[in-house]
Amino acid sequence: PMPHSRQCFVNCRSQTQVLRMAYTDWGGIDNPRVLLCVHGLTRCGRDFDTLAQALAADYRVICPDVIGRGLSDRLDDPVGYGIPTYSRNLLELLAQLGISQVDWLGTSMGGLIGMAIAAQPNNPIRRLILNDVGPEITSSSLTRIADYVGRDVSWSSLEEAMSHQRQVFAPLGDLTSTQWRQLLLPCLVQDSQGQWRTHYDPRIALSLRAIDPT
């Protein structure tokens, strides 16, 4: 049978507000083997659906929407968007779930958060798996990403939104139409005006512009 997922929420704190953070929970809730999957900058926890289904028989797989993305709350003050806040939030998630040890799979930003936590004493990370990220990021990369992420754009139809996003993610390769839908749909949302948007706060780009990689 296909493993089923649970859509869950916990409350965590920023410096000025209580935030609701969403996560998708797969596999046995009492399984001590826990894999935490943390997505990239503009993505959401649903990126890991296919992987989580494959691993749910052996692991409890937890896939959060980092604050500012997906079903999680947005910050009142965008200055808080950054690795320190994300690290605190995810440690708070694990603490609230009573989880003291995890294997951590981080894609891009998720890998950076994992590295930051793994560098702390008495951290909960048993194994750290990095995908699409390394210890160095060039200033030109940051500038390019911040410019793209910070644009508050919308599309009048889902087809238009999907077509645009397929161009953005074209470097991922020759995906099937089903794979494209699985990749793109969870990270798109329809607003109150009927317009389609990417499912994140465009103000997350502000913290990127403040980074000096030198």
Predicted regions and their residues:
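Active-site loop/oxyanion-hole signature of alpha/beta-hydrolase fold enzymes
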Residues: 15-19, 24, 50-53, 63-105
